[in-house]
Design a protein with these regions (language model features):
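Basic nucleic-acid-binding interfaces
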Residues: 1-84
Length: 84
């Protein structure tokens, strides 16, 4: 994981939850951690690791992830043992 990924990880865990994190940066972070990204129908994306799964939809308008998406990513990372 490089310094850009580390900054994104810190932003995901920041309080209050940010709504200005670019979705692409979140995807790159998850892939850098070793999480498998599976493209589904439409804008649906699944992230898989250690028998855990996170299903999300890519944002349609704008490139920033919604707060609930950032919280879901944060919960998933905690579940698989990743912390900043």
């Amino acid at each position: 994981m490089n310094s850009k990924h580390q900054k994104t990880l810190e932003a995901v865990f920041a309080k209050p939850t940010s709504a200005t994190i670019e979705w692409g940066k979140i995807e790159l972070l998850l892939i850098a951690i070793g999480i498998q990204c599976v493209e589904d129908e439409g804008s649906r994306v699944s992230f898989l690791m250690n028998n855990h799964r996170l299903d999300l939809h890519r944002p349609h308008l704008g490139k920033e992830a919604k707060r609930y998406q950032v919280k879901d990513v944060q919960s998933f990372l905690v579940l698989i043992g990743v912390k900043p």
